[in-house]
A protein has these predicted regions:
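Sec-dependent N-terminal signal peptides
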Residues: 5-15
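Mitochondrial intermembrane space
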Residues: 21-130
């Protein structure tokens, strides 16, 4: 196997999260969008995204839903410099795969962007430290 294929397999394994076998994803795109929108939290939306992804360009639309949900937790709380840092991290995801061809790489960038939003959501929604 080529190094490129092995790298792709490793990345797919890294972005997907283990889930219970009984959970099934909706078959249609619109139903998957609705599932992500109904998720009660950013983390749940991201987990459902991983479970129901296509690992193709269709993941861009799914990722947008996750990002919107996660951004609701923190976007208005960011200072100007924090917002610029967030935007830079999002842009880095796109640049990381910009020279790669194929829909799989659009999916990798979409996962990266969703992960950045999830990480910011976690940071800004933490409860008081005990």
């Amino acid at each position: 196997m080529s190094i490129r294929l092995l790298s792709a397999i490793a990345l797919i394994a890294a972005v997907t999260e283990p889930v219970a076998a009984e959970e099934e994803c909706p078959s249609g795109f619109e139903e998957r969008i609705a599932l992500l929108e109904r998720a009660p939290t950013c983390a749940k939306s991201r987990a459902d995204f991983a479970r129901c992804s296509y690992v193709a360009s269709g993941d861009v639309g799914l990722s947008d839903v996750v990002i919107k949900k996660c951004e609701g937790d923190f976007l208005t709380k960011l200072s100007k410099s924090q917002r610029q840092a967030y935007d830079r991290r999002q842009e880095q995801c796109d640049r990381k795969y910009q020279n790669q061809s194929g829909t799989m790489y659009r999916a990798f960038a979409a996962f990266c962007r969703a992960d950045v939003a999830r990480d910011y959501s976690r940071r800004f929604t933490k409860g008081p430290k005990s």
